[in-house]
Amino acid sequence: MKNYAQHVKEKLLESIQSLVSLKEMFVMHRDKDFTRNRKLSFETLIKQILEMEGNTLAHELRHYFSFSLNMPTVSAFVQRRALISPDAFLYLFHTFNFAIPFENLFEGYRLIACDGTDLNIARNPEDKENYFQSNPDEKGFNLLHLNALYDLCSKRYLDTLIQPGHKENEFRAICQMADRFPYSGKTIFIADRGYESYNVFAHIERKGVNYLIRVKDKDSNGILGAIQFPETDTFDVDVHKCLTRKQTKEVKAHPEKYHFLPKNSTFDFLDLHTNPFYNMDFRVVRLKISEDLYECIIT
């Protein structure tokens, strides 16, 4: 194969051309936006935004247009950029990913890591969903929360979900990304303790993929704290649980079989009438990783 970096670049440019051919679907006013030939065409804007390095807009424009005296103004760029729907970049993201095969696997499996992080954005006290202020007399800041799926073997992002800073919910984010996961083949979702949830397990299972999630230890207030395990330091056991919101005599008499979920515990596949029970089977492994330190995973 030709130089891999050049191959990837060609696929990106092909994906951009595919987007340009459908630009009417990704503008705010399809009957008039980008219908005339101007310096800041739809294609030029897409490429320039992808090439930006985090400098000021004035600096980015000078660099992109090679310090031309006829380059567009910052105001013109902002106005033209506002005509492009965010869905344009979502389309480009997925089209580009699909254009390059997933050839790097781990023993036949695609390994998908899920995690989240805060992103600092421009300070704006009027942006209530994203503005944080520790004390009334202190200068505040703005944050977004980025959730992402990352292919560990291919070293590329497969999906992202951005949430307002004050509405961060990593449980909901991984469920949404699992629901819309478009790739076929053997796959394992991998996540840390912040994703320990029956609802997360169920969403991933129902997508037909596997998961491996680090969880709190057996003596904690987490999922394992409500399950009986062997009196050994390490173990590898299969667990069956029937989840329910009912509190019948049967449920109370058999805690080894049933797990009661209160109303404030999110689970999207239960209700008291049509779906009162939900069966789950999973494997719990407790590993010794140092002299006095253990880790637990559910898979």
Regions found by a protein language model. Give the residues of each.
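Single, function-defining residue in the core of a domain
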Residues: 1-55, 63, 77-84, 91-92, ...
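Flexible coil/turn residues that form the inter-helical turn or adjacent wing/linker of helix-turn-helix
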Residues: 57, 70
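Short alpha-helical "recognition helix" segments of helix-turn-helix
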Residues: 60-67
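Short Lys/Arg-enriched helix C-cap and helix-to-coil transition segments
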Residues: 88-100
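Conserved beta-strand elements of the Class I
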Residues: 110-112
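Extracytosolic and intramembrane catalytic regions of membrane-associated proteins
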Residues: 132
